[in-house]
């Protein structure tokens, strides 16, 4: 009986070719099963290096719709025309730890969006806080290392963080926020994200405005009442699961896009440097002595489709704040300038030199243009002191955040932040603890006193001979 068509149909094997698969592995003269060799070769190379930061993540597809006319301040094609829609892909992530870490770790959270515009890809690379630990890019490697695992024990060691913070007071503002409940209470669907940096939106005549834009979750602030997420503490992927299952059942999360605008002539009058990433553009909460920079809603982002293949559609995603479109330009912010180099450089290492040819990056229209508006002189110049030097604002913004918490949230919210700080400070050696107290004395005498009393009480409790938590050999070191 002649073989039928199904019998003749070749099998796709690991070489990528359609041909019958042989099972013999070796002959007298050595290996000859090229399919086994190819399968082993593929297995040895199927993983790629994880991201240097933001390694743990998840993603989904969606669309962005313009909801308000902002043509008076904007000449970006994607944002011109109420009702205009643009497809996009979004990746959420933790920041400091490795790919297998928990979604709920006390850490910054990232939300990166790649918009597939008619003029190329435009990336919004954002964090869940509108400011950062540092303003000098030279400090970035040390800052990240201070929040990772101890190189000797491979355990998290808060002493490394406090050693960095006490030597770099511009990090105090971010440190206080991270140790409040804002540092842990979230789901990806309720996360708001901020680009942090000042960008320039440039008009056809060459004039521009400094802008800061952000995405506010339509589900409201994360746990407004200060409660914690109702999740299984043993599930490190609770936020990832929550996002995926919500989209699968049609409960699509959405965010409102907002922009804050500063005329370059007004920038020197604001009382702080808008290019300093350790400070935020005041929305009216704090600092009370500085002008409010109101936000203006202009669009809505909705995520409505899960990925089919996590590795190719999320793990291989490549974002960069340098992926811009005509009408938007970077500011002189030193951290932004450094990120525009570091992100593509990291992708060349992680994904290879041809990462720009990945399917998610391909568009029917070219991504390189000569359409950008030009201008020859500054309308105003924002100048800065040496970025590495401490400044009174480093303490002022941290002080005002501490003082506004009972009004902004609740006294219990502030108390929990102090408790979290005390637990983090207490394992350190006496010399480091004293340095922490002295540093916070420059922020607030009341806060320094509460930290000293709380942390030293924990130290005394652990030193008791009958204490179950008494420090054992191999305790956290500096």
From Swiss-Prot:
GO terms for biological process: hydrogen peroxide catabolic process; indole alkaloid biosynthetic process; response to hydrogen peroxide. Heme binds at residue 343. Keywords: Alkaloid metabolism, Heme, Hydrogen peroxide, Iron, Metal-binding, Oxidoreductase, Peroxidase. The keyword Protein biosynthesis does not apply. One of its GO terms (molecular function) is heme binding. GO terms for cellular component: mitochondrion; peroxisome. Pathway: Alkaloid biosynthesis; ergot alkaloid biosynthesis. Residues 459-478 are annotated as: Disordered. The active site is at 54. Its cofactor is heme. Its EC number is 1.11.-.-. The keyword Transport does not apply. Belongs to the catalase family. Catalase; part of the gene cluster that mediates the biosynthesis of fungal ergot alkaloid. DmaW catalyzes the first step of ergot alkaloid biosynthesis by condensing dimethylallyl diphosphate (DMAP) and tryptophan to form 4-dimethylallyl-L-tryptophan. The second step is catalyzed by the methyltransferase easF that methylates 4-dimethylallyl-L-tryptophan in the presence of S-adenosyl-L-methionine, resulting in the formation of 4-dimethylallyl-L-abrine. This is Catalase easC.
